[in-house]
């Protein structure tokens, strides 16, 4: 069964315009992400789905493959779906059951072990989306709206994702930072088969998705399950120019 990775990368980020092309340790961010995806032996091919010719040309300049997509997509998953449609139109060998890995274009610290873990998880999830999470250990991370939190049921299926601190341990937070075992950070990587991907993008943007600016809430609001795999590894999404300095310090640690 074919497994591909598609990296959505748009130029016009509100907080960091041109982010995929910003340099991190002598390489554009998008090249770091692409190389991380290529390091997984479980992925057959990697593509960047972009809305900007500058990103496309940059990807091609380092030997990568890029697909031009519309600038009007409300989420990265919608952009990926257009890229997959184009691949299908060109006769690429994708089936309804083929796995598509969505690796966010601003996650240059993702490890191949995380990608491989998600692919393994997806082999048993024909009707669900897959993703990863890691336990939160720092109070600042729990209250940081740029770090998405997730809570899940006893079977590992997501109940909710939020930029707010969830679950909020009322009694313990009155006295100080709670050290409970239910605080998890969402890692910016998804997996789905082609059928679920098509189903997802056929749904209208949901109210919770708009409020939280989290595309995965569209799935939950429409009854699509999201299986959460727990990882011991961390990652770091770049949201602002200031994050580049932090990422540079972390890069050697996470390599």
UniProtKB/Swiss-Prot annotation:
Organism expressing this protein natively: Thermodesulfovibrio yellowstonii (strain ATCC 51303 / DSM 11347 / YP87)
An annotated Gene Ontology molecular function: 3-deoxy-manno-octulosonate cytidylyltransferase activity
Localization: Cytoplasm
Disulfide bonds: none
CDD domains: CMP-KDO-Synthetase
Listed name of the protein: 3-deoxy-manno-octulosonate cytidylyltransferase
GO cellular component: cytosol
Domain of life according to the entry: Bacteria
Protein family according to the UniProt entry: Belongs to the KdsB family.
Encoding gene per record: kdsB
SUPFAM superfamilies: Nucleotide-diphospho-sugar transferases (SSF53448)
Keywords attached to this entry: Cytoplasm, Lipopolysaccharide biosynthesis, Nucleotidyltransferase, Transferase
Pathway: Nucleotide-sugar biosynthesis; CMP-3-deoxy-D-manno-octulosonate biosynthesis; CMP-3-deoxy-D-manno-octulosonate from 3-deoxy-D-manno-octulosonate and CTP: step 1/1; Bacterial outer membrane biogenesis; lipopolysaccharide biosynthesis
InterPro entries cross-referenced by the UniProt entry: Cytidylyl_trans (IPR003329), KdsB (IPR004528), Nucleotide-diphossugar_trans (IPR029044)
GO BP: any one term: lipopolysaccharide biosynthetic process
Entries under PANTHER family matching the protein: 3-DEOXY-MANNO-OCTULOSONATE CYTIDYLYLTRANSFERASE (PTHR42866), 3-DEOXY-MANNO-OCTULOSONATE CYTIDYLYLTRANSFERASE, MITOCHONDRIAL (PTHR42866:SF2)
EC number: 2.7.7.38
Biological function: Activates KDO (a required 8-carbon sugar) for incorporation into bacterial lipopolysaccharide in Gram-negative bacteria.
Reaction(s) this enzyme catalyzes, per UniProt: 3-deoxy-alpha-D-manno-oct-2-ulosonate + CTP = CMP-3-deoxy-beta-D-manno-octulosonate + diphosphate
């Amino acid at each position: 069964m074919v497994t591909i990775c598609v990296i959505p990368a748009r130029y016009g980020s509100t907080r960091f315009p041109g982010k995929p092309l910003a340099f991190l340790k002598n390489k554009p961010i998008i090249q770091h992400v692409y190389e991380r995806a290529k390091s997984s032996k479980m992925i057959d091919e990697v593509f960047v789905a972009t809305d900007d010719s500058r990103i496309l040309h940059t990807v091609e300049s380092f030997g990568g493959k890029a697909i031009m997509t519309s600038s009007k997509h409300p989420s990265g998953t919608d952009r990926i779906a257009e890229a997959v449609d184009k691949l299908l139109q060109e006769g690429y060998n994708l089936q309804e059951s083929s796995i598509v890995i969505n690796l966010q274009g601003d996650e240059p610290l993702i490890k191949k072990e995380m990608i491989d873990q998600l692919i393994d998880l997806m082999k048993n999830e024909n009707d669900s989306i897959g993703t990863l999470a890691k336990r939160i250990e720092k109070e600042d991370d729990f209250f940081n709206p740029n770090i998405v939190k997730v809570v899940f049921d006893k079977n590992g299926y997501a109940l909710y994702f939020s930029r707010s601190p969830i679950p909020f341990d009322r009694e313990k937070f009155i006295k100080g930072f709670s050290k409970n075992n239910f605080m998890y950070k969402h890692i910016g990587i998804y997996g789905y088969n082609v059928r679920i991907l098509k189903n997802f993008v056929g749904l209208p943007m949901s109210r919770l998705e708009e409020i939280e600016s989290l595309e995965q809430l569209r799935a939950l609001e429409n009854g699509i399950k999201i299986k959460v795999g727990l990882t011991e590894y961390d990652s770091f999404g770049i949201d602002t120019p200031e994050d580049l300095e932090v990422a540079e310090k972390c890069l050697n640690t996470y390599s």
